[in-house]
Structure formats: C-alpha cells, structure tokens
C-alpha cells in the first residue's frame, strides 16, 4: 500500500468581517470567536481590540490584546478634543506586531488581526505581518470597514472571503473539515484496554469507557493488524488517525477511540430514535444511509446509499438533494469515511441529525451545522463484544446499552 500524506483541512481564504461605521460590535465578535476556538484547543495567535471608554479628552481608550498571552498594548493617542487626526498610535500598533510575528513563527491554526484600516491600507501598521501570514498559508481573520473594502481587495489580490458580522458566518468560514481536529482536541488521554474488530463494527475500550464505529466496507477481506499494534496505546494517540489518516480502517478505529471519550456512561439525553426527529416535516427529508426500519419511520424520505437499491439514490446525489431540504439524517459512518464535511456544507439551512452508534455525543459538533446527535452508550461491554465478534448489526445493540440523543438548544 502506498504511503499517503496526512489528511489536513483545506486552506482558507483570508476572512474579512465587513462592517459599517463603528467597529465595537465586530471587535467583540472577533474576541468571542477566537476565545471559543482557544477553549476548544486550537492554537490561535494575533491580536483583538478592546475598548474601555473615555480617557481624558479621547473618545475611547483602545488596546490590542495578544490572544495567546493576554498581554495588552495601548494604541490610543490623546490628541485632544478638537483633533481631527487618527487617534490610533502607530508606535503602539508596531509594538503589538510582535504577537503576530510569534504566531506566524509557531504556525498557529489561526491568526486574528483586529482590523485592516487606514494604517494597513497605506502599507503600515500590521500590513507586513498580514502579508507574511497569507504567504505562509496560515488562516487569517480580520475586520474591514466598508470604506477600506477596495483597499483590502487590492491588498489580497481578491483572494479573500468577505464575511457578514455574525458568529454563524465565522463558523461557516472556519469550515466543516476542522471538526475532526476539534473532536481530537477534546480527548483526554487514557490507557486503551482492548480494540475489537468485527465484520461490521469496531469497539475501543478503556477501563471506564467504550466507543464504537462502523467498520468500513473497504477494509473487508484485508488482513487485520495484529493486536499488539495497539498494545500500550493511549486513547489520544489511537484517536489521532480520525483526524489525519486516509486509511479506512485506521480512521474508523480512530473514530471509535473518539467515541470512547465522548460516549461515556455519564452522558444523558433523550432516548428517541434519531429518525423520529424528522417525523411530520412538511418539506423534503434526505437520509444518508439505509437505516433499519427507515421505510416505516420515514416512508417519503429521499434515501442516498453507497450501493443504492430500487428507489434510492447513489452517493453522488448528496450535493443535488441536500440543498433546499428541510431535514437531513446523516449516518455516523460519514465521519469515518470523510464525507461528513461536504454533506454538512450541502445541508446548510436544513435541520441536520448525525445518527448511529458511531456518533460522538458532544456539543462540539453543533457549531459545524449539526442540530441533533443520536448516538449510543455501551453498558454491557462483554455482551456487546460478543455481538460484534459474531458479525452482528446495530439492531442487536439495544440490549447492551442505551441510545442517547442530544440537541443544540
């Protein structure tokens, strides 16, 4: 088998949040967004702007804050009440540029720059650092007042994504492909007790938790890795291929490891079947995957399958059917086969549920366009392991655990 490069999220065009006169709301938006990414484990560098009200004769006291260290740089000039000059202190901005240079050197996951404004439009301020980050392929997020939009377009050569000033727009720009890294960041390490691979399912165990993932059909018939391959592995290392590997079996084992962290015995939620979330919808419902009892629960659904039967659609139909749908039920197998990001992107505007025992039960996925998570928590691991080794399907799981549904409220 050839050695493949690691799976990495696609590059992002520099994001520019466009706003009218006044930027206080946008400053707060960038501050909140970068803070949330940092809480999730992403490496974010650069500066955000914070404004603290009146200072002597100035309208505001402005600071640039290094998002990685919290160090603040004063960028206000007190020019007096009658001054018509810019109140931004170029020396303070130059001092703050060290935060950007460090983030570029460390290859941050995201570089945030409070704004592209008058200084940058004239090649000053943080312009050099912005260009360096873009040239290095580091994702860049900034804000641009409408008066400087033409200058920004010239600065980037038109290679930019113009964003509306709201959180949903920022998360759409950040992209669904980054959900894998997001899930991986949340995993706490633990010794892996056992990895079981059956004909249809994979199970990863720690001392206190169990995670599942469907075995990819592409791995059937291939020789399985020897058990010692995972001997002494930590859960985080075992989960890494979920975000980095193109090998179907490695990726699926990684997803099962993710679920060994997230689908722990303490998770609680509704016990409803994930397909029942779409009962009674007036608009079209698209289902990715031929779930058990699908015809009974959603008789009018448009069903997409890798191996379609009569009245079903092939895999390529996803981008044709999902736009404009009211609801979309997506099999959790899409996480391991790496089709989930494009399916979520095509489902914008629909109510989306990720359904199946391989669904990670974590709110981390809600920001990426998932509204409900219908997964499984194992309670009798030995009994379920026997089912998996016997080649059993998910229909036999319910006696050995509980189905749990979480909602984005």
Language model features by range: what are they?
Residues 121-131, 340, 344:
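Short Gly/Thr/Asp-enriched flexible loops that form oxyanion-binding sites at enzyme active sites
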Residues 131-136, 298, 321-323, 344-349:
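Short, conserved loop/helix-junction motifs that constitute active-site signature segments
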Residues 154-173, 353-409:
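C-terminal functional extensions of proteins
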Residues 293, 298-321, 326:
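Histidine/lysine/aspartate-rich catalytic loop segments that bind and position anionic ligands
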Residues 2-54, 67-68, 171-292, 388, ...:
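Electropositive, gly/pro-rich neighborhoods at or near active sites that engage anionic ligands
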Residues 65-106:
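Helix-adjacent hinge/juxtasegments
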């Amino acid at each position: 088998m050839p050695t493949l490069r690691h799976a990495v999220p696609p590059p992002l065009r520099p994001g520019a949040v466009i706003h009218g006169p006044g930027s206080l709301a946008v400053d707060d938006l960038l501050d909140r967004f970068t803070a949330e990414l940092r809480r999730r484990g992403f490496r974010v560098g650069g500066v955000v702007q914070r404004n603290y009200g009146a200072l002597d004769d100035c309208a505001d006291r402005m600071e640039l804050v290094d998002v990685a260290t919290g160090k603040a740089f004063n960028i206000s000039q007190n020019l007096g009440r009658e001054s018509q000059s810019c109140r931004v202190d170029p020396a303070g901005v130059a001092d703050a540029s060290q935060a950007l240079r460090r983030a570029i050197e460390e290859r941050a996951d995201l570089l945030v720059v409070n704004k592209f404004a008058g200084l940058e439009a004239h090649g000053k301020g943080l312009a050099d650092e912005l260009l360096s980050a873009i040239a290095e392929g580091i994702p860049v997020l900034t804000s641009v007042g409408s008066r400087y939009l033409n200058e920004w377009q010239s600065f980037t050569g038109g290679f930019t994504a113009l964003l509306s000033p709201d959180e949903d727009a920022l998360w759409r720009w950040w992209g669904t492909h980054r959900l894998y890294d997001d899930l991986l960041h949340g995993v706490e390490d633990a010794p892996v007790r056992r990895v079981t691979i059956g004909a249809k399912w994979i199970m990863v165990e720690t001392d206190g938790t169990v995670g599942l993932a469907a075995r990819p059909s592409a791995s059937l018939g291939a020789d399985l890795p020897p058990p010692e391959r995972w001997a002494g592995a930590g859960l985080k290392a075992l989960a890494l291929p979920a975000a980095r590997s193109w090998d179907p079996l490695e990726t699926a084992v990684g997803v099962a490891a993710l679920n060994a962290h997230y689908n722990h015995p303490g998770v609680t939620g509704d016990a409803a079947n994930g397909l029942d979330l779409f009962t009674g919808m007036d608009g079209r419902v698209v289902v990715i995957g031929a779930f058990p009892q699908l015809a009974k629960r959603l008789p009018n659904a448009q069903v997409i399958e890798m191996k379609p039967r009569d009245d079903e659609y092939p895999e390529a139909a996803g981008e044709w059917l999902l736009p404009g749908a009211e609801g979309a039920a997506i099999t959790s197998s899409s996480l391991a086969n790496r089709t989930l990001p494009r399916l979520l992107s095509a489902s914008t505007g629909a109510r989306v549920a990720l359904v199946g025992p391989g669904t990670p039960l974590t709110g981390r996925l809600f920001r990426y366009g998932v509204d409900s998570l219908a997964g499984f928590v194992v309670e009798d691991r030995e009994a379920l392991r026997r089912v998996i080794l016997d080649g059993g399907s998910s229909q036999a799981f319910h006696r050995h655990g509980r189905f749990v549904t979480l909602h984005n409220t």
